[in-house]
Amino acid sequence: MLRKRLYLVFALFMAGLMLFTACTPKTGGNAPVKITIFVGFGAGSDPDSMAALNTIAEEYNASHKDIQIEFMFSTWEEHTSKFSTLLAGDLAPDLAFPIGIQGIAEFYDEWIDVSPYVKRDTYDTSDFYGPSLQLLNFNDKTIGLPLGVYPSVTFFNEDLFDAANVPYPPKQYGDTTWTLEKMIETAKLMTLDGNGNNAASPNFDPTKITQWGWGGWCGPFRTVPGKFGGNPLGMSDDFKTANMNTDGYLEGMQFLYDSIYTSHVRPSSVDEGSTFTGMDFTFESGKVAMFECFSWSSYAFPNFTTAGNWNVAAVPAGPHGDVVSPVNADTFAIPSHSKHPDQAWEVATWLMQPEMQSRLCGIFGCIPSRKSLASGWVDSMSAEYPNGDFQVFIDSINYMDASPNNESWVPNYSKVWDTTENAMSRILSGESSDVQQVMNDLQTEVQGYLDEYWAANP
C-alpha cells in the first residue's frame, strides 16, 4: 500500500512538472534579437528627442517579434569616451544613429561597409539626392544610407537691407553677379558706425561699429577653402603632405582677415564676446545683415524672427567661380564589433523608410535626403516661417561639398582639426595680423601630425 501511494505521489509530481514546463515561455534560440542603437554622435540626446525616439522604439517593438530595439543615449561631450568604453568592454552597440561625417571619421576603422547589403537586397537608392549618396562613399567602403542633410545658405535681415535701400541677394543659383566680392560690397553698405556712416563712406569710423553687414561663416575653417578652389582637407590625396599655407587655405584665411580688419564688415571674436553675449549666432541680434550657416541653425529661427524679418539666399561664388554650400549630414553606421550586423541593417532600413525618415528629420532638424520628401519639408517650414524661401535650402543640396566633405577623415583627425581651428582663432581674435605666418605655423604643425601618423601606420 505504501509503495502504491508513493508511486501515485511521484506520478502526480511528474505530471505537474510537465505541465509547468509546457506553460513556461521558451528562451534561447527563439528569443528576439535586441539591437542597441547608440545616440550621441549628433542630435537626439535632448529630453524631447529622447522621448520621441523611445516612442519609436515602442512602436517598432510592438510590431516586430524577432527583433527588438533599444536606444542608448550619450551627451555630445561624452560620446567619444562612452563609445570607446563600450568597444573596449566588448559591449559594442549595433548601430550608431544618427551620426555625421565627423563621427564617422572619429572611429572610421570601426564601421562596416554596407554596400554588400545594398547589393544583396537590390536596395533602391534612386530617391536619394546624388550628392547625399556620394557623401557616404569613401575610398574603401560605403558607410550608411542618407538620412538627412544640413546644407548652408545665406541668411539675411530684410529690415536692414530695406533701411539701407540695398537690393536683396539672389535666391536662385546661377546668378554670376553674386560673388564673395559682391557680398563684401553689399555688406559695406550695411556696416554702420555710431554716426550712421557706412563702411563705404570716407567718414566711417571702424573703431565705433554698431552694425555689421556680414557675420561670417558659422562652420569650422574647413568649410572655407573650397570656396577658394582648395581642398577642404588641406593635404595631398594620399594624406601624407600638408598643403595649408598656400592656395585655398591661404586665400580663405586672408579673406577672413580682410573682412574684419580691412573692409570692417565682420565682427572679430572680441566683438562677438562683448556685443553678442548669450547668443549662438550674431544674426540673432538684429545688428548683422547677413551670414552663412547650415540648416541645423533652425533651432535659432525663433530668435532670428524676434530680431527682424529674415530670409535666405544662395551662397555666393568664390573668386575662382566655385559655388560651395558646406554641408553636414546624418546617417547610420554599423560597428564591426556588433554581434548582430544583419539585424542592425534590417533595423536601419526600417528607419530609412520615407515616412520614418520624415519623422526622424523632424526630431533631429535635418532636411530629408529623399527627393520625394522635399515638397513636404518646404511646406512644413514655410507654414512655420512664412517669410522664408525654403526652396533655397533644397537647391543648395546640389552645391554641397560632398567629396571630400569638410568633416572627412584625415590622419590624426582630432589633432589636425583642433590645430586648424586654433589658426582661425588667431585671426578672428586679432592675435596675429600676419596671415602667411599663421598658415606657415599651421602647415608645420599639421605636417608633424601627418608624419607621426604614418610612422605609426606604415
For the regions a language model picked out, list residue spans one by one.
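Hinge/lid segment of periplasmic solute-binding proteins
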Residues: T75, I99-V153, E181, A200-T207, ...
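Extracytoplasmic/periplasmic substrate-recognition and gating elements
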Residues: Q68, D140, T262-H264, N303-S369, ...
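Conserved N-terminal structural module of periplasmic/extracytoplasmic solute-binding proteins
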Residues: L2-R3, Y7-A11, A15, F20-Y108, ...
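Short helix-initiation/N-cap motifs at beta->coil->alpha
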Residues: F73-K82, G174-K182, S268-E284
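Glycine-centered hinge/linker elements that transmit conformational signals in sensory
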Residues: T186-A187, D237-G273, V315
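Extracytoplasmic/periplasmic solute-binding protein
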Residues: N139-L147, S152, T179-A242, V288
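Short, solvent-exposed loop/beta-turn-alpha elements that line the ligand-binding surface or hinge
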Residues: S115-F128, K171-D175, N203-T207, W212, ...
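C-terminal capping/gating helix-and-loop segments adjacent to ligand/active sites or protein-protein/ligand interfaces
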Residues: N387-E445
